[in-house]
């Protein structure tokens, strides 16, 4: 059963993901981390792993926000059908 919380969370996620400031910050951060990873000394395994972990977490955050957005859309559709 869909909840209002899912609908609200989905809307908030969509607002965040579509926010130009958030998009710029996310892209800049990912670009910075990728650049740091590429520029790191091949022997500096710790630095390379830290960059890899940070990029992976950043991508997972984006994926999770997308999941919230999609779940909210589905919940909203369920509410709409229940009202008919």
Regions found by a protein language model. Give the residues of each.
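Serine/threonine-rich low-complexity intrinsically disordered regions
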Residues: 3, 44, 74-75
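Amphipathic, hydrophobic secondary-structure cores in small proteins
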Residues: 22-66
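Short linear motifs in intrinsically disordered/low-complexity regions
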Residues: 9, 45, 78-81
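Charged low-complexity stretches with an acidic bias
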Residues: 55-84
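N-terminal acidic leader/helix
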Residues: 2-36
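Residue-level signal for functionally critical sites in structured catalytic/ligand-binding pockets
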Residues: 15, 47, 72
């Amino acid at each position: 059963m869909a909840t209002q919380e899912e609908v609200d969370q989905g809307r908030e996620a969509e607002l965040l993901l579509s926010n130009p400031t958030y998009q710029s910050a996310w892209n800049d951060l990912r670009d910075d981390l990728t650049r740091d990873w590429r520029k790191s000394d091949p022997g500096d395994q710790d630095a390379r792993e830290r960059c890899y972990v940070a990029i992976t977490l950043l991508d997972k955050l984006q994926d999770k926000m997308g999941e919230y957005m999609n779940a909210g859309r589905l919940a909203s559709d369920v509410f709409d059908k229940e009202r008919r």
